[in-house]
Amino acid sequence: MFLLVLIPLISPLWAGEIVTQNIKQWAKKAVEEEKALRPIAARNTVAVLYFENKTGKSELDPLQKGLALMLITDLFNVKGLQVVERVKLQALVEEMGFGTSGLVEAGNAPRVGRILGARWLIGGEITRGSIKIQSSVLDVGEKKIIGQPMVMGEMEDLFRLEKGLLFEIINFLKIDITPQEREELRRYCSTNVRALNLLFRGIDASDRGNYEKAAQFYESAIKEDPKICIARGALQELQALGLIDSKKRSRDMLRTLRDRGSLTDQLSPEDATKRVRTPKDIPSSQGRETP
């Protein structure tokens, strides 16, 4: 992974998980006006690229967007950070014709970061072994690597690996967090790896415009873990935008979504075995403001 010191031009609104026509138009205009961008001093703006799967195992492909999704969700809750919406990254990927691997090719990442308006750009790769996430922190101004965080473990520990990476990133960004904030950031999106995988597949299906399939993945993720983050909001966003046929959706499922707590439920490490509901301030899918 690398962090690049770049130029910020970030929108203050969080755009949810749907790459809307407005977001696509933004990406098209941003690329067209790329040469006119001026260096603007701004603090603590971060964008997270998709991770590259170098394991040769296609079953790990959902982690490419999934790891980025979890990091973005967590970094959004770090006070003092501005986080670029994932949908803006996705729109740029489509507009610029990059695949997931193309984002991290030489010269592409700084360009993407500049258009996104990010001071720091986070990316990385998943390599062979159980799960090994190798990363580097690059200071572009100084042209030197200032850190190389790395986490590794079993697939069943994915949710813990992401937290380890999160706190390494926070350390390299030299962001001070209180013990209370640290404890809140330790809350898991889910400890159910199957549920996480279904969520990640739903995000990818949505990006591809297969909204009915995305809804099915979200529903399956919620059935696996009713307290999983993001999935409820993403499903309700699909419904609110009229992208799925709500009449075909199970009334029982919709009732379950309303009755099983808020969109912000997450699990603390202590709750991982207790399965006790704990509220967490994950932003809703629309109208979210960056701290």
Q: What are these regions, as identified by a protein language model?
A:
Residues 239-266:
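Alpha-helical linker/edge segments of TPR/alpha-solenoid repeat scaffolds
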Residues 227-228:
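Residue-level recognition of tetratricopeptide repeat
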Residues 54, 62-64, 78-125, 129, ...:
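Short, solvent-exposed, polar/charged sequence segments at loop or secondary-structure edges
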